[in-house]
């Protein structure tokens, strides 16, 4: 037996000697080693001996202790501030802390034992243990209380099996301990409290009609703020009589509006708010409290549910206008063109005033694609924040300034949990270039998604769980307790205005009718709808509460309802003859702009810049501060650019782009370029942001051109297409005088944002009268790089083109690129521009321009002549027009493939004509050019497969042109790759064989 008794002792000795080998201790040992290198006497003798034998380089030891250069300093944050670590459960440390405090109190005579005598050592130990157990219980409520809160108005939710996790007995308290005052050191706002006093505060705070999730937050200040804001004997949900009447009034308006429409337009789709009426007073509170804290503007985005109610009761849209739309009337004046949209997609704007604070509200128009409006709203808000600060701002605007504009997003529960763009937007929320000082998310959680139960629409307990990834606090609240909902909205607004971080309100409610008013929900949710039919409305429940409090009588409530109904009847009558007299899309920042004239084909604007100005900008583009250490390859890049500016020759793609950006910035147009790796450029061509090779400092030549210039921002975005493109589109809606560009890493990846192209960029102006000057740069070109690095799918964008809705271009020269970028800002209207941009042409010896082509009377050319026609030193001299046997029309990089092949073959009777802008199609210009070659064969050549590229789009247009010029050949022949399922081959040998084949077809 003796041997067996010694074994554990030996095992512990071995563990004591080897525990430092445990991987989790590596950081600690590295820090100890660094301390030893600084001062060997600062560590224990055993460690001193150990380190002395290692003999490592002292500098390496210190670097290892510091960790990699890219690590975030002071992270993760050490949790504190509540006597207990939120994460590590280090209760021994807490006990020591409390014991020391109690000893101090005992010494001062502030803490006494049961007999009124000073505390003995034993009593101090017992009191400290009581304190620790109490704090453990408090922490359990903070962590898990929300699971026990009364959140479901219908009472259908299953109660969680809590294993008595919140019971005092679980923490060692018995009823005999309930009268004893326990030291809790101002946790819950009390220094001493009995167990029942603690439970009263904890149950009211965490297990009532509000459930708060905040213990996942790692910032101690944010956690402490929430605790202090909601915990404590005086922190009940309490409203003045006036406040309660205001809530009741808004509820009556919300419910009465839905019921009125239900009677007047029986069965018509309205996606009513019935069951979620508490949203309306909550939104009022957000605007009111925000206004008190400095809020100037709210940009709203929401789905269809409750939209008409928000428009009328919160935004102040006249009811007569809504009733006019219900009877099929247009929402725009008769003289305004547009295809229109259904009434529950429309936007609006208004000013509301509370307590002398004026707040501007704007609701963003959106499609039925759920949640896709979120990034658009964030982008709009960011632009409005930038406009408040001004065009000459620094690139770091304080969040306290940004907080003056609030993006407020309303979500459905199934969509918030289901749509990936939600997570993308949360991912954007804290990033440089995309921060908006916190979005307020309000989930209308009616516990159903069309016909699908939550158990089948998400894998997590709450729809809001995705927001935990960015440590947003989440306020769950019962929608049948309007006071709790308004209180949650108030606290959420205060948190956002204080910390400039996103926050979520998850309002549990229900949908009184089907998904739309013509739908029967009992087919799929019989039990839920049985409960709903028997359930009183929110107005009834709240009215009964206020009657019980003696604040109102039933007659008062009936009178309020009758007055509201009478007002709506008056508005309904007015709606019969209502005529919209003002379309608001050219107000504010858009003043001075107009809608484009379809008939006006020559719309290039004045885009040329004097050579002197270009040279001044060019000089600044290649200058860096004296003490700035440029990478030697970048220095060569700058030297080459300096040479271009000096000679005025050889201007490449990236230089033309920088000159376009620089000239616009000098003229007062901010430039915002966003996308993956845009600072440097995917192909290492741009380099508009330079990095010091010794200290990583940044220098941006485009922001150092001259005093008073507008800002240039290049934003390396997160690895997302959908949210980032939606964000940039939103930005372009709010600031028409900024050139906003989004660049795909490769054009192939742009279809990750297809919804934004389809629902907003191509159709937003026709549906909602919202212009955008957004530029999309999509690298495109077949160079043997395989199916995912070749095609931006040009055909997709061309298929979307109609009614002068956007521009699609595939330009071939730096000069034309320069002019098309400047053209975006130099006309008095805005249109989106989809640009196929080059890859190999970025460094192609022929794809260069001169300063003369950017200045003087130069402008953008929708068609470009054959270089052999007007460049004297070309290897080929073309025949006269009458002798040309074939005209090969093309667009983009394939022109250079054709040109070089023609030169190699010595062909002089084939003319190459470039269509630089594919839409709006340059029909008149093409008639003028092709009239020269009436007898020639016409060929369309493209590098894309036949079922892709521009062929299907351009063929009918070209036939129309040929008919107009009475051409000998009335049909255009196709030359290009054959139709294919995949855009491009991944085999270089096959790529080259295909290229040779279609060049032969075009030129042979």
Curated annotation (Swiss-Prot):
Catalytic activity, EC: 1.2.4.2
Keyword Transport in record: no
Protein name from the UniProt record: 2-oxoglutarate dehydrogenase E1 component
GO MF, one annotated term: thiamine pyrophosphate binding
Record organism: Brucella ovis (strain ATCC 25840 / 63/290 / NCTC 10512)
GO biological process: glycolytic process; tricarboxylic acid cycle
Gene3D superfamilies: 3.40.50.12470, 3.40.50.970, Multifunctional 2-oxoglutarate metabolism enzyme, C-terminal domain, TPP helical domain
One Pfam short name: OxoGdeHyase_C
Names of the cofactor(s): thiamine diphosphate
Entry GO terms, CC: cytosol; oxoglutarate dehydrogenase complex
Keyword Oxidoreductase: yes
Quaternary state and interactors: Homodimer. Part of the 2-oxoglutarate dehydrogenase (OGDH) complex composed of E1 (2-oxoglutarate dehydrogenase), E2 (dihydrolipoamide succinyltransferase) and E3 (dihydrolipoamide dehydrogenase); the complex contains multiple copies of the three enzymatic components (E1, E2 and E3).
InterPro entries: 2-oxogl_dehyd_N, 2oxoglutarate_DH_E1, 2oxoglutarate_DH_E1_bac, DH_E1, KGD_C_sf, ODO-1/KGD_C, THDP-binding, Transketolase-like_Pyr-bd
Reaction equations catalysed: N(6)-[(R)-lipoyl]-L-lysyl-[protein] + 2-oxoglutarate + H(+) = N(6)-[(R)-S(8)-succinyldihydrolipoyl]-L-lysyl-[protein] + CO2
Disulfide bonds: none
Domain of life: Bacteria
Keywords: Glycolysis, Oxidoreductase, Thiamine pyrophosphate
Function: E1 component of the 2-oxoglutarate dehydrogenase (OGDH) complex which catalyzes the decarboxylation of 2-oxoglutarate, the first step in the conversion of 2-oxoglutarate to succinyl-CoA and CO(2).
Family: Belongs to the alpha-ketoglutarate dehydrogenase family.
Gene that specifies this protein: sucA
């Amino acid at each position: 037996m003796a041997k067996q008794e010694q074994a554990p002792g030996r095992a512990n000795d071995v563990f004591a000697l080897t525990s430092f080998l445990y991987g989790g201790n590596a950081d600690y040992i590295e820090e100890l080693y660094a301390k030893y290198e600084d001062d060997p006497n600062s560590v224990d003798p055993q460690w001193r001996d150990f380190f002395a034998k290692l003999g490592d380089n002292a500098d390496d030891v210190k670097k290892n202790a510091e960790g990699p250069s890219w690590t975030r300093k002071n992270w993760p944050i050490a949790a504190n501030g509540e006597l207990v670590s939120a994460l590590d459960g280090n209760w021994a440390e807490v006990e020591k802390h409390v014991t020391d405090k109690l000893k101090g109190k005992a010494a001062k005579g502030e803490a006494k034992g049961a007999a009124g005598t000073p505390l003995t050592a034993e009593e101090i130990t017992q009191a400290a243990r009581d304190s620790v157990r109490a704090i453990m219980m408090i922490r359990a409520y903070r962590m898990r209380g929300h699971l026990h809160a009364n959140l479901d108005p219908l009472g259908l939710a299953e109660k969680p099996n809590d294993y008595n996790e919140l019971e005092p007995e679980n923490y060692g308290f018995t009823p005999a301990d309930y009268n004893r005052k326990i030291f809790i050191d101002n946790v819950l706002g009390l220094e001493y409290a009995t167990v029942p006093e603690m439970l009263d505060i904890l149950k009211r705070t965490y297990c009532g009609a509000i459930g708060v999730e905040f213990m996942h937050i790692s910032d101690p200040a944010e956690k402490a703020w929430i605790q202090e804001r909601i915990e404590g004997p005086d922190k009940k949900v309490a409203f003045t009589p006036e406040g309660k009447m205001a809530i009741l009034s808004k509820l009556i308006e919300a419910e009465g509006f839905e019921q009125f429409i239900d009677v007047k337009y029986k069965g018509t789709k309205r996606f009513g708010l019935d069951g979620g009426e508490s949203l309306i007073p909550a939104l009022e509170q957000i605007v009111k409290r925000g206004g008190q804290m400095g809020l100037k503007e709210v940009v709203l985005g929401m789905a269809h549910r409750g939209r008409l109610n928000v428009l009328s009761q919160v935004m102040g849209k006249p009811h007569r206008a809504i009733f006019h739309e219900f009877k099929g009337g247009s929402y725009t004046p008769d003289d305004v063109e547009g295809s229109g949209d259904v009434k529950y997609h429309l936007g609006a704007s208004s000013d509301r005033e509370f307590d002398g604070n004026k707040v501007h509200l704007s609701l963003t128009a959106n499609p039925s694609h759920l949640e896709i409006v979120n990034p658009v709203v964030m982008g709009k808000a960011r632009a409005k924040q930038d406009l408040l600060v001004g065009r000459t701002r620094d690139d770091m605007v304080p969040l306290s300034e940004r907080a003056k504009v609030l993006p407020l997003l309303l979500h459905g529960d199934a969509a918030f949990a289901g749509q990936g763009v939600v997570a993308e937007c949360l991912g954007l929320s804290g990033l440089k270039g995309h921060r908006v000082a916190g979005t307020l998310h309000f989930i209308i959680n009616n516990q159903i998604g069309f016909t699908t139960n939550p158990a089948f629409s998400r894998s997590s307990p709450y729809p809001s769980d995705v927001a935990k990834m960015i440590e947003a606090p989440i306020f769950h609240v019962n929608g049948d307790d309007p006071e709790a909902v308004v209180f949650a909205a108030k606290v959420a607004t205060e948190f956002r205005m204080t910390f400039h971080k996103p926050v979520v309100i998850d309002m549990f409610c229900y949908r009184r009718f089907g998904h739309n008013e013509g739908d029967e929900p009992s087919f799929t949710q019989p039990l839920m709808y049985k409960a709903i039919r028997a359930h009183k409305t929110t107005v009834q429940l709240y009215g009964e509460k206020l009657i019980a409090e003696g604040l109102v009588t039933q007659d008062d409530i009936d009178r309020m309802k009758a007055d509201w109904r009478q007002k709506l009847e008056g508005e309904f009558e007015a709606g019969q003859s209502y005529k919209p007299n003002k379309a608001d899309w050219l107000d504010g920042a858009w003043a001075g702009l107009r809608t484009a004239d379809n008939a006006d084909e020559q719309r290039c604007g004045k885009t040329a810049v004097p050579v002197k100005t270009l040279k001044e900008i060019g000089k600044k583009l290649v200058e860096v501060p004296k003490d700035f250490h440029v990478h030697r390859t970048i220095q060569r890049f700058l030297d080459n650019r300096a040479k271009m500016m000096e000679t005025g020759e050889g201007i490449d793609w990236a230089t033309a782009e920088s000159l376009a950006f620089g000239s616009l910035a000098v003229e007062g147009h901010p430039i915002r370029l966003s996308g993956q790796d845009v600072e440097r450029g995917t192909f290492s061509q741009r380099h508009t942001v330079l990095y010091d090779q010794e200290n990583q400092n940044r220098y941006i030549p485009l922001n150092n051109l001259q005093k008073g210039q507008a800002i240039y921002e290049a934003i390396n975005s997160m690895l997302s297409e959908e949210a980032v493109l939606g964000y940039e589109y939103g930005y372009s809606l709010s600031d028409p005088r900024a050139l906003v560009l989004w660049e795909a890493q490769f054009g192939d990846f742009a279809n990750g944002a297809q919804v934004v192209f389809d629902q907003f960029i191509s159709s937003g102006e026709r549906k909602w009268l919202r212009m955008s000057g957004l530029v999309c740069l999509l690298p495109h070109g077949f160079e043997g790089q395989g199916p995912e690095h070749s095609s931006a799918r040009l055909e997709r964008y061309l298929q979307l083109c109609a009614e002068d809705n956007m521009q699609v271009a595939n330009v071939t020269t730096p000069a034309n690129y320069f002019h098309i970028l400047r053209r975006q800002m130099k006309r008095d209207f805005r249109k989106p521009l989809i640009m196929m941009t080059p890859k190999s042409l970025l460094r192609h010896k022929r794809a260069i321009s001169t300063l003369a082509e950017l200045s003087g009377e130069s402008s953008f050319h929708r068609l470009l002549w054959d270089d052999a026609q007007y460049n004297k030193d070309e290897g080929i001299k073309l025949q006269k027009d009458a002798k040309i046997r074939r005209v090969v029309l093309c667009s983009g990089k394939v022109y250079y493939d054709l040109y070089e092949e023609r030169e190699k073959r010595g062909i002089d009777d084939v003319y190459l004509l470039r269509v630089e802008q594919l839409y709006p199609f340059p029909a008149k210009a093409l008639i003028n050019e092709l009239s020269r070659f009436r007898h020639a064969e016409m060929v369309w050549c493209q590098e894309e497969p036949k079922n892709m590229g521009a062929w299907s789009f351009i063929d009918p247009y070209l036939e129309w042109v040929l008919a107009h010029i009475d051409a000998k050949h009335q049909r255009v022949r196709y030359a290009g790759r054959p139709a294919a399922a995949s855009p491009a081959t991944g085999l270089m040998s096959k790529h080259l064989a295909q290229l040779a084949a279609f060049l032969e077809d075009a030129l042979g």
